[in-house]
Curated annotation (Swiss-Prot):
Record's compositionally biased regions (Polar residues): 147-156
Ligand binding (Ca(2+)): D1278, N1280, Q1281, C1283, D1286
Region (Disordered): 97-1195
Residue positions with a glycan: K262
One Gene Ontology term of the molecular function aspect: metal ion binding
Protein name as annotated: Collagen alpha-1(III) chain
Biased composition (Low complexity): 100-109, 186-198, 310-321, 354-379, 399-412, 606-615, 678-691, 717-727, 907-934, 945-960, 1068-1084, 1120-1132
Residue numbers carrying 5-hydroxylysine: K262, K283, K859, K976, K1093, K1105
Length: 1464
């Protein structure tokens, strides 16, 4: 590979081995160049010396060194030809062959023609399919190179070569068009082979001569070099069917193609004799197809070739004659069910079959007479949970949501097809030469330019040595079909091949003969009950409908059962020969055929017309292996193969030299989430951090201990009783007291704040069916209701008649929770009793466990009309309609489209109890549902047995001071402590009241006689006395008064889990609680029994739009589309992953700004968008003029039904239910107030979220403001305030309001991570450079990383400060201060989320602080250093990578604890 490099990447030249490296560059004028005293024109190419090549490009000289390949040549004596740079292998010469038809051998090449003028750039082609890998080129020629060979690029051929010495043989030019063939000459003597002439530059193509008469067939020449891939031609007409040839030799393995459809099996081709390989030439342009040659003699049969890859499907051949009927095959697998046939005539009566399993429920019988009023049934067992309903229809488009936060960069898509070339920009000035670049990967081969004008013929060079034989060229395009050859002898049968892949299904065969009677199957499961009515005769088939729009791609279906084998299709045309596939397993050997008697050779008769293909004869004996046949013509290029499996991973390369620090790149795409690391050992307590911000006023602390005693004062008057004594040790827990009696019920308390969601209340009893009302005004779309608990399955009732509309009730308060019923066993289905009047509703059973979504049930029969819907709020008065003609009231019209759900109606009156339904069969156990919300607190269990005392745990950190506890019972008298040192003198207290008379003291020792003085005032207290000796232990005093509660002790060690206590007895039912708010939606129950088929319901309204799904996996690459119009230049794509740092190049000159390119043509029109959301209702219009009086309505209108009828949706024309009677319903203020209260509570939770999963806060600071009473702990936050489903769980420090997010994982395991390559030490990034390393990620591991990244981005925007700690565990590794040198040169670097680096010294904004430094020397023991970084730029955190310096030795290990990142 060799490339010219220029500042603006001018062009790329592709060679086979060598690499050109930019050496020098000089400028003259715009047209010509001057170099070393010689003048050259633009686009001239010359070699000043053998290993240098130069080109003149519009006044600029580009010279490059030719670097020879370092790989040794595979020949004993490589040679460097004169005037060349690199060594090549000498080629043996071969004598010219004497051809059998008397023609002389091919003469030497003619003199090279003059070079052509440079062609203009061709239009960019469409991107081609990847070609087959080409054969390796022959080594080039090079002088003064150590080993390896090279030739410079053939694309230099368009430049004028000026050199003092004639060049060696170049590559052959493109083939000219065939000239007119001359008359055949007389056979000459075979001439001796001439020496090859100098290879000239390619000549200018001559004009195409008229086609001459076909010459005699020439002998098969040696295989020419592989031609250049031409553009795909149009498919030719299928040629006549050729004779089966012997198998060809195995070709080189091509690039695996996409698997084609299996074609019809082609005929074997003949083996060609491998010709001598000529020197590899350039790929020539496709020549015109030659005339058909005469058919050659058929070669002997070759050895069977390896199985080829499946070829393209050939065109279907003409249908062959019907073969003789074969013996009956094995019965095929059962086919798919056919369409229903017409009813057959009744068969003969069969024998009595075995008793079948019980059938499914029959269709409902005639409606029975109403039975007598039944008693209320006992509470039924809870029915099994029902299936999830089938998904609702698509809802109408909701209003457009708030634009979401920008998503993260998606996974990189597969490369699109190459776009068309953009308009070239203006040429910039040449840059200064850069340093040598590293050897690049081979570039794609450029398109062939047009032939240049002929150059001046060069002097004839010396004879070159023959090159080594090249690899076989790629297959050429198939030649035109030759004339049909005579029929060959039938070859012996080959061994059976391995079974082929399953072919495409054949055409549908005629009905086969009836198979034998199958074994009786097991009784099937109960079918779903059929709809009523007898089956009608099948209607005549309808015409085909219009093609529907293509639906969305379905999910991958399960593999279908194999269909019955179809009859053999007609024999297709032979397909093109596929590439040889991998060798298959040996098939079973075929049976030897009978040996035929030898026939005498007959005279060749005239060729008869092609007879029809006869039936296949018996296989003949295996013949001897034939000689290798001539090479067949190269076949067409096959389809690209399936991509091969990845090779084994290579060994790790040597570490590169450290490059200079590159500029900070754009943030890379987030790395994949690493596995959770093993939890690290618990570190010792860290040192005290820097003082935090001043907190708010804390809660009142516990009562302080009593201070030390002051020095003895002067004797006072008798004091009052002394202060309370010091608290004694805390007494042990008392035994539990007897259970107190039940207290009187207290008065109702004031309304509390809304509680957490309680369990779902039972559904109210179903009211009696009301008459169907007119459609009400279309209400605002309510939120989807909660699914009701599946009741037991009732028998299908008769369809009731439409009753008159009942009045609408208001929403009832949710009922109390019913006690869960015991689960009954499944009873045998009883006969259907006569319908009694409905009994009272039994209590609702507890909801079943959540099941997986059941399959969609069969549609049930049309149900009887439901009860009246709840009345919507009265709509605005509509405009008066136009006057209608007086008509008789028509029959009731069909039901209108269902209106949107109104607000929940009140509970109806209790209906009379229905008969308890038969318990349905138990459904399959569902998958465990999602974890539900915490249940209500159960009754306390009886105390479990005392557990064994656990081992003492490590002492925990002291918790915050608790609230003062209740006063403890008096402890026993403590042992008298030693006397304390006298305290400093206290202030004189106020004089106390006189105390009771004390006991007389013992007489003191006599003092020294003082001088008589005047009575003085009280003196200052004396100095501290010396401490007295320890007194004897006094007797136990009487118990003191209860002491003040002591400070809370440190938390005791956690005891082991106690054994599970016995289940407590069920407590008495508590008083009914106040109705709780509606519970959260229960998880779907397991699948219920399949319902009866209902009549087709009317089309429902569209459901609400679902949440946006997570991005799916990338689909398979589509087929390339047609080239689009040239689009405008796109915006720069996202930065790729950070590459290795390249060598530091010299700065180039500043280029001038180019002219702005033209604006591209407008893109194609986009697809039609989805239907927009329904607009908000417009402002009410002005009232219209009053209409004329309507016709008199029918009797008995008005009431709630009249209101419901007003403004009915799309009511056509006059409605008899319009009226102006006053509204006749009572407003239940209590229910309205309770509804308002519930709505108020929900709004309150939106305004002041409590940090639960249901009501996440924006961040912990908001939570602290709204709820100052909350303690520090884990809460849910949703910084982007979008859907609650992406809320994240964080730790809230309620002292400061910080929001802290843990890393995931939180530790890097302690181990040997890096081995030094011996170069000088440097910082090594853990996530970027170390094997198994990873960049740190944050947030819950079960959330997608891009969701956490979005939340972090919003959290940064909401914060003004951020901080984070990192603990580095070291073993023989310096983390910060090097104790030996006393400096911080070996300190770690940390990388923030914006790829900024934090260091030990430098700019104070980017330096970290060290809280504890235990990694200052190599001790062979584990220690740790704790780093902290605080910033007012929240964008810099969290820390995503760490780069130690002092690592790489065999005994150097480290690990990391990643502390949580906290935002404030």
């Amino acid at each position: 590979m060799m490339s010219f490099v220029q500042s603006g990447t001018w062009f790329l030249l592709t060679l086979l081995h060598p690499t050109l490296i930019l050496a020098q560059q000089s400028n003259v004028d715009e047209l010509g160049c001057s170099h070393l005293g010689q003048s050259y024109e633009s686009r001239d190419v010359w070699k000043p010396e053998p290993c240098q090549i130069c080109v003149c490009d519009s006044g600029s000289v580009l010279c490059d060194d030719i670097i020879c390949d370092e790989e040794p040549l595979d020949c004993p004596n490589p040679e460097i030809p004169f005037g060349e740079c690199c060594a090549i292998c000498p080629q043996p010469s071969t004598p010219a062959p004497v051809l059998p038809d008397g023609h002389g051998p091919q003469g030497p090449k003619g003199d090279p023609g003059p070079p052509g003028i440079p062609g203009r750039n061709g239009d960019p082609g469409l991107p081609g399919q990847p070609g087959l890998p080409g054969p390796p080129g022959s080594p080039g020629i090079c002088e003064s190179c150590p080993t390896g060979g090279q030739n410079y690029s053939p694309q230099f051929d368009s430049y004028d070569v000026k050199s003092g010495v004639g060049g060696m043989g170049g590559y052959p030019g493109p083939a000219g068009p065939p000239g007119p063939p001359g008359p055949p000459g007389s056979s000459g003597h075979p001439g001796s082979p001439g020496s090859p002439g100098y290879q000239g530059p390619p000549g200018e193509p001559g004009q195409a001569g008229p086609a001459g008469p076909p010459g005699p067939p020439g002998a098969l020449g040696p295989a020419g070099p592989a031609g250049k891939d031409g553009e795909s031609g149009r498919p030719g007409r299928p040629g006549e069917r050729g004779l089966p040839g012997p198998p060809g030799i195995k070709g080189p393995a091509g690039m695996p193609g996409f698997p084609g459809m299996k074609g019809h099996r082609g005929f074997d081709g003949r083996n060609g004799e491998k010709g001598e390989t000529g020197a590899p030439g350039l790929k020539g342009e496709n020549g015109l197809p030659g005339d058909n040659g005469a058919p050659g003699p058929m070669g002997p049969r070759g050895a069977p070739g390896e199985r080829g890859r499946p070829g393209l499907p050939g065109a279907a051949g003409a249908r062959g004659n019907d073969g003789a009927r074969g013996s009956d095959g094995q019965p095929g697998p059962p086919g798919p069910p056919g369409t229903a046939g017409f009813p057959g005539s009744p068969g003969a009566k069969g024998e009595v079959g075995p008793a079948g399993s019980p059938g499914s429920n029959g269709s409902p019988g005639q409606r029975g007479e109403p039975g007598p009023q039944g008693h209320a049934g006992a509470q039924g067992p809870p029915g099994p949970p029902g299936n999830n309903g089938s998904p609702g229809g698509k809802g109408e488009m909701g209003p457009a949501g708030i634009p979401g936060a920008p998503g993260l960069i998606g996974a990189r898509g597969p490369p699109g097809p190459a776009g068309t070339n953009g308009i070239p920009g203006t040429r910039g000035p040449s840059g200064e030469p850069g340093k040598n670049g590293a050897k690049g990967e081979p570039g794609a081969r450029g398109e062939r330019g047009e032939a240049g004008s002929p150059g001046i013929p060069g002097p004839k060079g010396e004879d070159g040595k023959d090159g080594s034989p090249g690899e076989p060229g790629a297959n050429g395009l198939p030649g035109a079909a030759g004339e049909r050859g005579p029929s060959g002898f039938r070859g012996p049968a080959g061994p059976n091949g391995i079974p082929g892949e399953k072919g495409p299904p054949g055409e549908r065969g005629g009905p086969g003969p009836a198979g034998p009677r199958g074994v009786a199957g097991e009784p099937g499961r109960d079918g779903t009950p059929g709809g009523p009515g007898i089956r009608g005769m099948p209607g005549s088939p309808g015409g085909p409908g219009n093609d529907g729009k293509p639906g969305p791609p379905g999910s991958q279906g399960e593999s279908g059962r194999p269909g019955p084998p179809g009859p053999s299709g007609p024999r297709g045309q032979p397909g093109v020969m596929g590439f040889p596939g991998p060798k298959g397993n040996d098939g079973a050997p075929g049976k030897n055929g009978e040996r035929g008697g030898p026939g005498g050779p007959g005279l060749p008769g005239p060729a008869g017309k092609n007879g029809e293909t006869g039936p296949q004869g018996p296989p003949g004996p295996t013949g001897p292996a034939g000689d290798k046949g001539d090479s067949g013509p190269p076949g067409p290029q096959g389809l690209q193969g399936i991509p091969g499996t990845g090779g084994p991973p290579g060994e790790n390369g040597k570490p590169g030299e450290p490059g200079p620090k590159g500029e900070v790149g754009a943030p890379g795409a987030p790395g994949g989430k690493g596995d959770s690391g093993a939890p690290g050992e618990r570190g010792p307590p860290g040192t005290a951090g820097i003082p935090g911000a001043r907190g708010g006023a804390g809660p009142p602390g516990p009562e302080g201990g009593k201070g030390p005693a002051g020095p003895p004062g002067p004797p006072g008057a008798s004091g009052s009783p002394g202060l309370q004594g010091m608290p004694g040790e805390r007494g042990g827990p008392g035994s539990p007291g007897p259970k107190g009696e039940k207290g009187e019920p207290g008065g109702a308390g004031a309304d509390g704040v809304p509680g957490k969601d309680g369990p779902r209340g039972p559904a109210g009893p179903i009211g009696p069916p009301g008459p169907a009302g007119q459609p009400g005004d279309k209400g605002e779309g309510g939120s989807p209701g909660l699914p009701g608990i599946a009741g037991p399955r009732g028998g299908p009732g008769e369809r009731g008649e439409h009753g008159p509309p009942g009045p609408a009730g208001f929403p009832g308060a949710p009922g109390q929770n019913g006690e869960p019923g015991a689960k009954g066993e499944r009873g045998a289905p009883g006969e259907k009793g006569e319908g009694g009047p409905p009994g009272p509703a039994g209590p609702t059973g507890s909801s079943g466990p959540a099941g997986p979504p059941g399959p969609q049930g069969v549609k049930g029969e049309r149900g009887s009309p439901g009860g009246p819907g709840t009345a919507g709020f009265p709509g605005g008065r509509g405009l008066p309609g136009p006057p209608g003609n007086n008509g008789n009231p028509g029959p009731p019209g069909p039901s209108g489209a269902p209106g949107k759900d109104g607000p929940p109606g009140p509970a109806g009156n209790s209906g009379s109890p229905g008969n308890p339904g038969i318990a349905g069969p138990k459904g399959d156990a569902g998958q465990p549902g999602e974890k539900g919300p915490p249940g209500a607190q159960g009754p306390p269990g009886s105390p479990g047995p005392l557990g064994i005392a656990g081992l003492t745990g490590a002492r925990g950190l002291a918790g915050p001071p608790g609230m003062p506890g209740p006063r403890g019972s008096p402890g026993p008298q403590g042992i008298k402590g030693e006397s304390g040192k006298p305290g400093a003198s206290g202030h004189n207290g106020e004089r106390g009241p006189p105390g009771p008379q004390g006991l007389p003291g013992q007489p003191g020792t006599a003092g020294e006689p003082g001088r008589d003085g005047n009575p003085g005032s009280d003196g200052q207290p004396g100095r501290d006395g010396s401490p007295g000796g320890k007194g004897d232990r006094g007797e136990n005093g009487s118990p003191g008064a209860p002491g003040a509660p002591g400070h809370p002790g440190p938390p005791g060690p956690v005891g082991p889990s106690g054994k599970s206590g016995d289940r407590g007895e069920t407590g008495p039912a508590g008083p009914s609680g106040a109705p709780g708010p509606a519970g959260a939606r229960g998880a779907p129950g397991p699948q219920g029994p399949r319902g009866d088929k209902g009549e087709t319901g009317e089309r429902g309204s569209n459901g609400i739009k679902g949440h946006r799904g997570f991005p799916g996996n990338p689909g398979p690459p589509g087929s390339p589309g047609a080239a689009g119009h040239q689009g405008a230049i796109g915006s720069p794509g996202p930065a790729g992953p950070r590459g290795p740092v390249g060598p530091h190049g010299p700065p180039g000159k500043d280029g001038t700004s180019g002219h702005p390119g033209p604006i591209g043509p407008p893109g194609p029109r986009g697809n039609r968008g989805e239907r927009g959301s329904e607009g908000s209702p417009g402002h009410p219009g002005q009232p219209g003029p009053p209409g004329p009086p309507g016709a008199p309505g029918p009797c008995c209108g008005g009431g709630a039904a009249a209101i419901a009828g007003v403004g009915g949706e799309k009511s056509g024309g006059f409605s008899p239910y319009y009226g102006d009677d006053p509204m006749d319903f009572k407003i239940n203020t209590e229910e309205i107030m309770s509804s308002l209260k519930s709505v108020n509570g929900q709004i309150e939770s939106l305004i002041s979220p409590d940090g639960s999963r249901k009501n996440p806060a924006r961040n912990c600071r908001d939570l602290k403001f709204c709820h100052p009473e909350l303690k520090s702990g884990e809460y849910w936050v949703d910084p982007n305030q979008g859907c609650k489903m992406d809320a994240i769980k964080v730790f809230c420090n309620m002292e400061t309001g910080e929001t802290c997010i843990n890393a995931s994982p939180m530790t890097v395991p302690r181990k040997h991570w890096w081995t030094d390559s011996g170069a000088e030490k440097k910082h090594v990034w853990f996530g970027e450079s170390m094997n198994g390393g990873f960049q740190f990620s944050y947030g819950p591991p079960d959330l997608p990383e891009d969701v956490v990244d979005v939340q972090l981005a919003f959290l940064r925007l909401l914060s003004s400060r951020a901080s984070q700690n990192i603990t580095y565990h070291c073993k023989n590794s310096i983390a910060y201060m090097d104790q030996a040198s006393g400096n911080v040169k070996k300190s770690l670097k940390l990388m923030g989320s914006n790829e900024g680096e934090f260091k030990a010294e430098g700019n104070s904004k980017f330096t970290y602080t060290v809280l504890e430094d235990g990694c200052t020397k190599h001790t062979g023991e584990w220690s740790k250093t704790v780093f902290e970084y605080q910033t007012r730029k929240a964008m810099r955190l969290p820390i995503i990578d760490i780069a130690p310096y002092d690592i790489g030795g065999p005994d150097q290990e480290f690990g990391v604890d990643i502390g949580p990142v906290c935002f404030l």
